[in-house]
Amino acid sequence: MNASLYQQYVQAKAEHPGKYARDLATLMGISEAELTHSRVGHDAKRLQSDARALLAALESVGEVKAITRNTYAVHEQVGRYENQHLNGHAGLILNPRALDLRLFLNQWASAFTLTEETRHGVRHSIQFFDHQGDALHKVYVTEQTDMSAWEALLAQFIIPENPALQLEPLSTPEAVEPTADDATVDSEWRAMTDVHQFFQLLKRNNLTRQQAFRAVGDDLAYQVDNNSLTQLLHIAQQDQNEIMIFVGNRGCVQIFTGLIEKVTPHNEWINVFNQRFTLHLIETAIAESWITRKPTKDGFVTSLELFAADGTQLAQLYGQRTEGQPEQNQWREQIARLINKDIAA
């Protein structure tokens, strides 16, 4: 099976030389993990699936490029796997303004290392996949990576066999009616003292994020035009205040904090090119753009949240804020410049 899959991959790659493995897998009707599994013995090797141990070992290799993506957005950050807190099912790699990750490790299922020949030379990577076979997180060598430490890590974690992937269909919970009326949701939202309490509010009331947004008053959540992301990135680039950009998937959220250096649209993509950070996001996939205001003990925190038609959250943007400090007035003024969407239209 793997041999024929690999041959299909080689053929698909020859027919579509510019496409990434994720897109080739989609063309082939398989997951990216299945595609990578078929490459073992060619340009891939299987690694032990202990994500915590692998992530901990990555601290030794120094600088790398970390990539976290979903279907519509790709977040690339150069940094180091330092300041790790990987206890329990959730983990943190906490380096604000550098490599800043939130990890949901019960979603991490398999790992591979790849050595790929590309038109830009050889690329070395470690790639992590979830139980559905989707890529959660990828780690690429840079010119500054300690290659002797990288090779030592691989020697420790490569396994000679390539066990079958135990893929599971994504369990989509049946549609459940919200358990609270709009007034209750609004009241509970206003009572929050920490943005992380929002997840508890959603769970308690069987709500999606967008259902909660629609339930509360316009002073807490309202829709804006879907070109708001591009507008806000250009404003932040012009004003040179620090912002935060969150992009995530089921198992990993990657966070950028800093100044925006260059914003470049290209076809359907909006791109941010910084020296150590890159964002690629399919602007045409944005179906809803929401401004939300969540109360904390330090005052309200305002964000722009972007959703695709299938409900996927593409990205979230905040003004840079340190715990214990109020939100930037400049960020609030920038948000206020975005155009309200007339929902009734």
Curated annotation (Swiss-Prot):
CDD domains: HemS-like_C (cd16831), HemS-like_N (cd16830). The keyword Transport applies. It comes from Yersinia pestis. Part of the binding-protein-dependent transport system for hemin. Disulfide bonds: none annotated. GO terms for biological process: iron ion transport. This is Hemin transport protein HmuS. It holds the Pfam family HemS. To Y.enterocolitica HemS. Keywords: Ion transport, Iron, Iron transport, Transport. The gene is hmuS.
